[in-house]
Amino acid sequence: MKRRIALAIGALALTAAGASHAQGTLSMTKDGATVTVYGDIDYYLSYMTSSSGSKQIALQDGAYLRTRLGFKGDKDLGNGYFAKFTAEQGLNETSGAQADATRLFDRQLWAGIATPGGEFRFGRQNTAIFYRGSYIDFTGRTLGSVVNVFGTPSRYDSDIAYISPRWAGFLAEVHYSIQGSQPQHSTNQAVSQGALDWEYGPFRVGYAGIAGRPPAGSVVDKTVFYNNFYGNWDYGKGKVYLAFVRSNNQSTTPGTPSGTLNNGGNPLGTTGALVTGTDTGANTYYNIYQVSADYYVAPTVRVGALYGQIKDTTNDVKNANGWGIGAYWDVTKDVMVYGLGNSLSNDPGAGFRPSGSAGLSKPFTSPADVNGQRIRMGAFGMVYKF
């Protein structure tokens, strides 16, 4: 079965590639339907140090835009209605491996219909919070972002979504994942989302939130949530960003070769795991504060900086703070080169680590290098989009 699916995808890619010679894009249009092959390759060389004394040089994947291959399409049904689909697979550029070996399309696989009154989608799809990364800070909430090291719930299975048009500056979005939903049943683990964004001239403010319920009667009977408030101002030559997050979606994670990292786990998960009701990390609540700004020194060159704090408001022991600086150069419309520097300082009880659009292929994994340590990183990389 997997072989037949792979052959079908290959045939579709070849067909679209053939059409691209005539059209200048990786798209094919027939009878009002358009199918596009898209993706990117993002790789970077990193130099990372820990205040423990450890150092590491590595080729990593996905600082800014995780490597991926996708297919998307739409068909005009008339009267302002369109049928749509997206199928997207994450890849690791450093090894050629799938981001998730258990799924063919781990990032997205959904179908829907766009109407004059909004868009309806069904399937595995990105969260409302995930889509708003570019509203959060100059990195697009990727490598260098303090908000990003906390972990962002990114996508869920069996998700039903509605996205409104923008009316009077407002855009609303709601999701309900029935992946674990069993109404009136003790194992109901539904995941719900809501978002509201307002845009007026150079100003934007908004909220995006997600919550997952544990099974009834769980040992840790806490709803796990992630609430993100944001605002930004386009001052003409760049933007200023403010972000605040309130969440209990953090926990410990196993270290290597042994021991435990004080942070890095997520009771709600970041790519589709449901709340089991057994993770005591859900008992600890955090506030995250971050300020960021960027500036275009040239039409194709942007520089930026940020500073953020993670505050453990329950026990005051898992605090961290960090900063990031970076520069992005759009060499062509398809190629971007970037350089980044960032620092993350953990309190003795904290164990946060840097993370990009993709998790680091080669992170520090020993508790001695992470817990209570200051981790610094320099990165230089490139994104090629097609």
Question: Which positions does each model-derived feature cover?
Answer:
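Outer-membrane beta-barrel "beta-signal"
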Residues: V331, V370-F386
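Outer membrane beta-barrel
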Residues: G24-M48, Q56-S181, N188-A190, G194-V205, ...
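Outer-membrane beta-barrel proteins
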Residues: M48-S52, T94-A97, Y131-S134, S181-S186, ...
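Detector for outer-membrane/organellar transmembrane beta-barrel domains
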Residues: Q193-G324, W329, G341-N342
